[in-house]
From Swiss-Prot:
Annotated a ubiquinone binding sites: F217
Protein name: Reaction center protein L chain
Residue positions binding (7R,8Z)-bacteriochlorophyll b: H154, H174
InterPro entries hit by this protein: Photo_II_D1/D2_sf, Photo_RC_L, Photo_RC_L/M, Photo_RC_L/M_CS
Molecular function per GO: bacteriochlorophyll binding; electron transporter, transferring electrons within the cyclic electron transport pathway of photosynthesis activity; metal ion binding
């Protein structure tokens, strides 16, 4: 595959974390590196085990395939392969692949001499996954509290986990997480539409620049965060949504086991209006 005009000067030796020059090469447009190799190995292992688990199941129908965690009776012990052991090894493989990919991103950043914002942000996604399949189950004492790897069974797990606490929408951390996810979508939509509107003027008009973009929001809401600032805002909003989603799940089960609607009874007992 032909290189773009600017690519060759960035394909330089160095910046690797492990392996030195051994895996310091590209395959087509893709940088390999030591962690590219480990990503591939973990991915192949995990995928092969998923296929094995599907073969043990009742059907090859996509919607019915499910790799289930061990029964809670196994606690945190290693389960037999057909009774949850596959899920445990697949989970380990997934974490290995995700972390390897993040470290590969670090190596690419080092080669380009740029900041580590991308692997840092991706690390929050990894943490969200680990919180569901490792941290929360460990805090609750059994791998069986992790979610199954299957289309319908995963949806069932989400529904059942919510109903275990009466109504998950009353979880305050869930409220904040969902609000931040929607706010992130709004910020990205506003930013994207502004850039497209400035870059696609009417016929005969010149392409507009940051001055027009800033002025639009100053005229609309009285303030513009700026071209660099909107990306900081977007990153902060997105990572905050992930953080509160993690807190939401860690609270439910390991810390609080009651009904989330009942949790709000403290509000009714505040002395400002509680005269009973």
């Amino acid at each position: 595959m032909a290189l773009l005009s600017f690519e060759r000067k960035y394909r330089v030796r160095g910046g690797t974390l492990i392996g030195g020059d051994l895996f310091d090469f590209w395959v087509g447009p893709f940088y390999v590196g030591f962690f590219g190799v480990t990503t591939l190995l973990f991915t192949v292992l995990g995928t092969a085990l998923i296929v094995w688990g599907a073969a043990l199941g009742p059907s090859w129908t996509f919607w019915q395939i499910s790799i289930n965690p061990p029964d809670v009776s196994y606690g945190l012990a290693m389960a037999p392969m057909a009774k949850g052991g596959l899920w445990q090894i697949i989970t380990f493989s997934a974490i290995g692949a995700f972390v390897s990919w993040a470290l590969r991103e670090v190596e690419i950043c080092r080669k380009l001499g740029i900041g580590y914002h991308i692997p840092f942000a991706f690390g929050f996604a990894i943490l969200a996954y680990v919180s569901l399949v490792v941290i929360r189950p460990v805090m609750m004492g059994a791998w069986g509290y992790g979610f199954p790897y299957g289309f319908m069974t995963h949806l069932d797990w989400v529904s059942n986990t919510g109903y275990q606490y009466a109504n998950f929408h009353y979880n305050p951390a869930h409220m904040l997480g969902i609000t931040l996810f929607f706010t992130t979508c709004l910020a990205l939509a506003l930013h994207g539409s502004l850039i497209l509107s400035a870059a696609n003027p009417g016929k005969g008009e010149v392409v507009k620049g940051p001055e027009h973009e800033n002025t639009y929001f100053q005229d609309t809401i009285g303030y513009s965060v700026g071209t660099l600032g909107i990306h900081r805002v977007g990153l902060i909003l997105a990572l905050s949504a992930v953080v509160w989603s993690i807190i939401c799940m860690i609270l439910s089960g390991p810390i609080y086991t009651g009904s989330w609607p009942d949790w709000w009874l403290w509000w009714q007992k505040l002395p400002f209006w509680n005269h009973g």
